[in-house]
Regions:
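C-terminal cap of thioredoxin/glutaredoxin-like
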Residues: 6-10, 16-30, 34, 115-214
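Structural alpha/beta surface segment adjacent to cysteine/selenocysteine redox centers
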Residues: 18-120
């Protein structure tokens, strides 16, 4: 099965979805052989206004719900990146960094995406900063200078925009969204956080319906 995952590295429910998706990738069962393609949806790209302390506190409250549902670790206020002075919640750089790794080192893209999420949510690092995104690349053994040069290129900016436009053209309204790809046909598997049993159930339903259609 070919699965398209539309998400964002700075989307808390996408971060919450890491463990169910990792478990599925490790043991795809009926979905085997499973291929996962990452598309960056664009949560808040090109934001320029710094986040207010009130809004930062609201988002941290929202993160508590994700933590409860998923068991994922989160930094507590006021040690989050959100609470750093002048933080701007621009999701384009992290998306572009992921697209850069997908383009140059595709076998590492899922690990990179997850590690950026962990850096932001669990370690409180500001992943809107190119140096932090390069740190993550280096952490995974990728060449920092090659990453940095590609990340800053117009080509990667354009490819990232293309991802955002692709997501919009599919009518994706929220993240994470999983889409099954069969030839030229796309089928929505699910949108929003799903625990592993629900995720397997959705895939089994789709696989069953697909088998009956053939």
């Amino acid at each position: 099965m070919n699965l398209i995952y539309v998400g964002d590295a700075m989307c808390s429910w996408c971060y919450g979805f890491v463990q169910p998706l990792d478990a599925l990738l490790a043991d795809p069962r009926e979905a085997a052989p499973l291929q996962l393609a990452l598309v960056m949806g664009g949560l808040r790209p090109f934001t320029t206004e710094p986040i207010t302390p009130t809004r930062a506190d609201e988002l941290v409250g929202y993160w508590h719900r994700v933590a409860e549902a998923s068991g994922q670790p989160f930094t507590a206020a006021p040690k989050t990146a959100l609470h750093s002075p002048g933080f701007v919640y621009d999701t384009e750089p992290a998306a572009r960094a992921t697209v850069t790794v997908r383009s140059l080192w595709p076998q590492h893209v899922w690990r990179y995406f997850k590690t950026v999420q962990h850096a932001f949510y669990a370690a409180g690092r500001n992943v809107t900063e190119p140096e932090v995104l390069a740190d993550v690349a280096e952490q995974l053994g990728l060449p920092r200078s090659e990453f940095g040069k590609a990340f800053a290129s117009q080509e990667m900016r354009d490819l990232t925009l293309r991802d955002f436009e692709q997501s919009q053209s599919w009518g994706v309204r929220g993240f994470p969204t999983l889409i099954a790809e069969e030839g030229d046909h796309l089928h929505l598997v699910g949108s929003g956080f799903m625990a592993l049993p629900a995720l397997r159930e959705r895939l089994a339903l789709w696989t069953s319906a697909h088998d009956h259609a053939h």
